[in-house]
């Protein structure tokens, strides 16, 4: 009887301490159009995206291969798609043009979060918002860059980027 008395509170303690997996909202991003809910993602995927930002800030394009899948795609607001090599070449040309014209383009991360649509299958959607500042000898402008990155097994598979002008 004594054992039963001690087991009952222990049982409730174990049940009461079990984490409840929360999910909210909906999306039809699944392969077959099935409606899924959002779950919190992980710091591991956010760390991959922060590494991406760090490498871009440092203009260290050679190490990007370490955090991107072999089939990675970059998709822009106008539907243009680039491979990783095309993305790197685009950045090198941009950097050269900016330097030649005494211009700068700097960006600061504003927020980042990760959501998981199906925790049983792997892969997370990470959102990172930047405030970008372009400066030339004659002008200064800012815009927001909103990136959605799909991270699977520690590698970035896809980057979708949308920009929003900031009116002065």
Per-segment meaning from a language model:
Residues 87, 91, 109-113, 145-150, ...:
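Hydrophobic/aromatic beta-strand elements that line small-molecule binding cavities or substrate pockets
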Residues 1-29:
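Bacterial Sec-dependent N-terminal signal peptides
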Residues 18-58, 62, 66:
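Short, low-complexity N-terminal intrinsically disordered segments enriched in polar/charged residues
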Residues 91-137:
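Surface-exposed, charged secondary-structure patches
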Residues 18-24, 142-168:
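Short beta-strand edge/turn micro-motifs at domain boundaries
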Residues 52, 63-65, 72, 87, ...:
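Hydrophobic pocket/interface hotspot
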Residues 35, 73-83:
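A short gly/proline-enriched turn/hairpin at secondary-structure junctions
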Residues 78-80, 138-141:
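Solvent-exposed loop/turn segments connecting transmembrane beta-strands
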């Amino acid at each position: 009887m004594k054992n039963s008395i001690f087991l009952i509170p222990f049982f409730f303690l174990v049940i009461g301490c079990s984490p409840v997996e929360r999910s909210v909202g909906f999306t039809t991003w699944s392969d077959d159009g099935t409606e899924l809910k959002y779950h919190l993602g992980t710091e591991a995927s956010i760390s991959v995206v922060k590494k991406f930002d760090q490498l871009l800030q440092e203009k260290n394009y050679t190490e990007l291969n370490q955090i991107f899948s072999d089939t990675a795609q970059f998709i822009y607001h106008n539907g243009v798609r680039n491979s990783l090599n095309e993305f790197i070449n685009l950045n090198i040309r941009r950097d050269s043009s900016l330097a030649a014209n005494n211009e700068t383009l700097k960006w600061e991360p504003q927020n980042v979060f990760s959501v998981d649509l199906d925790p049983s299958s792997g892969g997370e959607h990470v959102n990172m918002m930047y405030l970008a500042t372009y400066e030339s000898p004659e002008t200064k402008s800012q815009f927001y860059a909103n990136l959605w990155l799909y991270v699977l097994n520690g590698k970035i598979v896809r980057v979708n980027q949308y920009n929003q002008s900031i009116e002065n």
